[in-house]
Design a protein with these regions (language model features):
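Buried hydrophobic-core signal for structured, non-transmembrane domains
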Residues: 49-51, 128
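C-terminal boundary/linker segments immediately following FHA domains
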Residues: 2-9, 14, 26, 57-59, ...
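Beta-sheet-dominated interaction scaffolds and their linkers
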Residues: 36-40
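Short Pro/Gly-enriched beta-strand edge/turn motifs at strand-loop
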Residues: 26-34
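Glycine- and aspartate-rich repeat motifs characteristic of hemolysin/RTX-like Ca2+-binding segments
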Residues: 23
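Short coil-to-beta-strand transition motifs
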Residues: 41-46
């Protein structure tokens, strides 16, 4: 099992292999502070939170940052009397750091995805501006994605696709085609 965190900020995708250390601090970089998972958005606190392995199980601890953290579309809250409250992390968990009360993926926030499967292959970025529908081909399997929200993830047998609006990230031998759709209900897909 390769626990890893995929982090996307301002079009940049980074992967952190969490099993390489026990604690990973999340925060905004400054002259005096370099967290393990550095972020640049001003909505991120210097000491925003941390991922920590406790007895083989991964947890996220939010340090009660000003602009908060969203996990799976729910704002994380502090524990009793403002204490840090560990939240067990599961494969497929989506985090939005610095988004306030809303889980909005935007240039002011940082998106992250926790997974236990690691691909030792390069990611490809595809220009997806203007596309409202996608066809993802993984061997004989076809998956349709219509009107996705930024931060949508499709995991396939041989790879995965992350839709972020203007850019879509692809890993593995998948073929991804985009369509702008039409008013008559037909679709013309273009391969990127």
């Amino acid at each position: 099992m390769e626990n890893n965190l995929i982090v996307i900020e301002n079009g940049q995708l980074n992967i952190y292999l969490l099993d390489n250390q026990v604690v990973w601090e999340v925060g905004r970089m400054s002259k005096e502070h370099t967290p393990d998972i550095p972020m640049h958005a001003t909505t991120i606190s210097r000491r925003h939170g941390r991922f920590q392995n406790m007895d083989g199980i991964w947890f996220y601890m939010d340090e009660n940052p000003k602009n908060g953290t969203i996990r799976n579309q729910k704002k994380l809250s502090s524990g009793l009397h403002g204490r840090v409250k560990p939240v067990m992390v599961s494969p497929g968990d989506v985090f939005v750091f610095g988004g306030g009360k809303d889980a909005v993926v935007s240039p002011a926030t940082v998106w992250a995805f926790f997974r236990t499967r690691y691909y030792d292959a390069p990611w490809r970025a595809m220009d997806s501006r203007g596309y409202s529908k996608f066809l993802i081909v993984d061997g004989d399997t076809r998956t349709k994605l219509a009107n996705p929200e930024p931060g949508s993830v499709v995991e396939c047998e041989h790879g995965m696709v992350i839709y972020m609006g203007a850019l879509t990230y692809v890993i593995g031998p998948l073929k991804v085609m985009g369509s702008k759709g039409s008013t008559d209900g037909t679709n013309s897909y273009r391969t990127n």
